[in-house]
Amino acid sequence: AIIKSENDHIDWYDKNKDRPYWETYREYLKSDKQFSPDAVSALDKTTDMMMRNIEDPNRKGAWDSRGLIVGSVQSGKTSNFIGFLNKAIDAGYKKIIILSGLNKNLRQQTQLRIDEGLLGYDTAFMKNGVRDFKGPLARKRMILNLKPIHSATNSKINGDFKFTAAEHFMNIHTDEPTVFVVKKNKSILESVIKYFLNAPSVHGVSVESKPFKIKGHQGDYNSFIKDRPILVIDDEVDNGSVDTGEQKLNEKGEFDPEYDPKTINSRIRQILNIFEKKVYIGYTATPFANIFIHHEKKTKEEGLDLFPKDYIIDLPIPSNHSGLEKIFNIEKVDGDVIEDREIDDNYFFNIVKDNSLYHDDPDCAEGWMPPRHNRYHVPKYEYKNDDEVPIPPSLREAIMSFILTSACRNFRGYVEDGKSMLIHVSKFQDVQDIVYKQVSDYMDVLRSRMQAGHYLHDETISKFEEIWHK
């Protein structure tokens, strides 16, 4: 589904033109990542839809394209924007910024995915711009003699953007694609701003004199990049990017142009404001904060706010996605939820009854994780044997199921692929910390019991087998 505005958009995209970066990525997904033909075809269609809604990078004059992509939780949004970026580079976009969360871990995770699916090399081993091309995607691109895609950041935990390092090696790559994977951090975003405001010396691009300030820094910059568009992907756009302050109206009924937005929102908008041609695309599973941004909000220093003024695309749910409809057995007819659907063999949702002492009492405050508890709650499930880790049987079974699932994936050749299990049972960090310790202890117990000769080895194997046959 797509919602489009009536703004000044010019149709331009021809999917029948040569798209070598996309074609090598598509072959990589099919032959090396074992994506089904249907999944690759669906990705091709949705990314074509996105390309048709942005502007031609060679379009003359000033233009500003802003959109929002909405996808279900864990439904492949990162794969989608990597596919889209391959097509954008094929079309001629050269400078790409990916805003990837508020902390270094999230940034690193995104960089690893970009290394794998867009760059084709591990940026952790990059030194002074020299890349170590290894892996199937890199080989496919080397055969076609494609230009390398440069990275201003790397996949080390502290591999975020650094102005001095980028200036050192990127000034010789004036017309080749360059990707920045950065976290939403004040100092990092200001370093990116400074880098682009030094465009005449770094890039040799056409600039126009335009006074420009960076808040908190003295002096004016005088760069306005005219002939090279910027493409910004804002991952989890509802987290950190939205201005949560109140921009009031002045006596003319207009938004106060001197208003000071929240820091991250301000710096993102300033990056966009440096460029005459710009594309900004936000990705989220929860779009409500973004669609309620007022479409006329703007300031003198930041320009327009981040409202998706041109289009909103609702990504289709992949056929292999186990989302809330499957987990909670929800059936929809014409958008309406059918609540009394009969439980069938595909019903994923397991009603947990051992989390509290009195499961049917919503006010119960006793047991391992009752519905009502505070930050001082100590989760404890009582066993006859005091040596047992105090987590309930349902969580033990869930952990063992995850171990079996991971073993299956390893057996099928996905040893290097990430595997994770989320255990989120309390809104209180202190309580979650206790649960983390309990789960870690239980993992140690399982490892011990799986050792040959342990007196509970056979019993543990039998439990795994029982879960396998469920």
Region locations from a protein language model:
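Walker A/P-loop NTP-binding motif
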Residues: T78-G92, R113
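Conserved SF1/SF2 helicase motif Ia
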Residues: A88-L106
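Short hydrophobic/aromatic beta-strand immediately N-terminal to the Walker A/P-loop
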Residues: L68-V70, I97, L422
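Phosphate-binding P-loop
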Residues: E55-R66, Y414-D417
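Conserved P-loop NTPase catalytic core
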Residues: F125-R139, R228-D234, D243-R409, S420, ...
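Walker A/P-loop
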Residues: W63-F81
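Low-complexity, highly charged intrinsically disordered N-terminal segments
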Residues: A1-K60, Q111-L118, D122-D227, L231, ...
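Conserved strand-helix element at the start of the C-terminal RecA-like helicase core
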Residues: F180, D417-V435
